[in-house]
């Protein structure tokens, strides 16, 4: 692993020296490529514009070092993922070998003013294959947590933007745990709005969706729930072989459960439908501390509202008429 880190730092240093003042623009383009805002071809074209012809190889070496560091196996066809670099070819392409033929002035004039197609130098448009969407590694597409290699790649780019040289394994592990705990906090806020729960130590929520509900007309029920033994008593000097964090005795726990069941109501709570976007929207509005950053909070609220939108009958009818017109142009008939 140390070898890969040294290779990455050496490749980054060589690339920074080759870029010079254009290093900030290169990191910005690299970030856009990681976010799937631009394609690999567009990123290579921008790198080719920022680098000289003799320093293009530093761009390829840097990308190869990142992929090796993140342990991502990428299989690309030959010549599709790298920029051309004419290493030691001193001869100019296109010049035929042999003696030059003398041409008249008229031939030179006609050759110079031949009409050209202005679209010949434009970039060729390539239709995107729907199967290429499988290459996207965003959480919103895969519906899964990002892998350790993906997080490390994003962290390396962010570190370079802030002037850092490397990302340690401990930092990657901390981000992985932070993502998991952040999602658990969001799920806890959603479930706590739908189901009853109990509190331990005044802040820890547990026992979600318990079927035992207190009877509000019985005075015993309030006392039973308030005097609930949630944690074992703290021993100042535990005896030898005694675990201070042990659970209450089985007889006490059974007696406590029987008392709660006797003080509960006769009817069970109604079953709820699965969690939907409305529950998430309400939970984030009530528990705003779950997402403390205002920018991230506002962006996710907008995305939730967009998901909740659905077309009305007039828009559905207009869409149907539009599809029928398109089908009529193509010679098809929609039922």
UniProtKB/Swiss-Prot annotation:
The gene is TADA1. Keywords: Nucleus, Transcription, Transcription regulation. InterPro entries: Hfi1/Tada1. Residues 94-103 have a biased composition (Basic residues). GO terms for cellular component: cytosol; focal adhesion; nucleoplasm; nucleus; SAGA complex. This is Transcriptional adapter 1. Residues 83-103 are annotated as: Disordered. Its main location: nucleus. Residues 84-93 have a biased composition (Low complexity). It holds the Pfam family SAGA-Tad1. The keyword Cell wall biogenesis/degradation does not apply. Belongs to the TADA1 family. The lineage of its organism: Eukaryota, Metazoa, Chordata, Craniata, Vertebrata. One of its GO terms (molecular function) is transcription coactivator activity. It comes from Homo sapiens. One of its GO terms (biological process) is regulation of RNA splicing. It is found in: Nucleus. Probably involved in transcriptional regulation. Component of the STAGA transcription coactivator-HAT complex, at least composed of SUPT3H, GCN5L2, TAF5L, TAF6L, SUPT7L, TADA3L, TAD1L, TAF10, TAF12, TRRAP and TAF9.
């Amino acid at each position: 692993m140390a070898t890969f880190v040294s290779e990455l730092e050496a490749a980054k240093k060589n690339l920074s020296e080759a870029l010079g003042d254009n290093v900030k623009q290169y990191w910005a383009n690299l970030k856009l490529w990681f976010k799937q805002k631009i394609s690999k071809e567009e990123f290579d074209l921008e790198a080719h514009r920022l680098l000289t012809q003799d320093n293009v190889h530093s761009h390829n070496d840097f990308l190869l070092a990142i992929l090796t560091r993140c342990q991502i196996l990428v299989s690309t066809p030959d010549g599709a993922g790298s920029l051309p670099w004419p290493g030691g070819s001193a001869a100019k392409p296109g010049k035929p070998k042999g003696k030059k033929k003398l041409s008249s002035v008229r031939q030179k004039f006609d050759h110079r003013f031949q009409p050209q197609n202005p679209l010949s130098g434009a970039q060729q448009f390539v239709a995107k294959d729907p199967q290429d969407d499988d290459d996207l590694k965003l959480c919103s597409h895969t519906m899964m947590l990002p892998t350790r290699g993906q997080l490390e790649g994003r962290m390396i780019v962010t570190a370079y933007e802030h002037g850092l040289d490397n990302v340690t394994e401990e930092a990657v592990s901390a981000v992985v745990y932070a993502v998991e705990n952040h999602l658990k906090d969001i799920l806890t806020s959603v479930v706590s709005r739908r189901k009853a729960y109990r509190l331990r130590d005044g802040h820890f929520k547990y026992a979600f969706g318990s079927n035992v509900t207190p009877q509000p007309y019985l005075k015993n029920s309030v006392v039973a729930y308030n005097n609930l033994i949630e944690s074992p008593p703290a021993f100042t000097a535990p005896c030898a072989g005694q675990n201070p964090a042990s659970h209450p005795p089985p007889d006490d726990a059974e007696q406590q459960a029987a008392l709660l069941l006797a003080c509960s109501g006769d009817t069970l709570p109604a079953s709820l439908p699965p969690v939907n976007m409305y529950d998430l929207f309400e939970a984030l509005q009530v528990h705003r501390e779950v997402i403390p950053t205002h920018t991230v909070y506002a962006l996710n609220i907008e995305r939730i509202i967009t998901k909740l939108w659905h077309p009305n009958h007039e828009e559905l009818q207009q869409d149907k008429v539009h599809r029928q017109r398109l089908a009529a142009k193509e010679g098809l008939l929609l039922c």
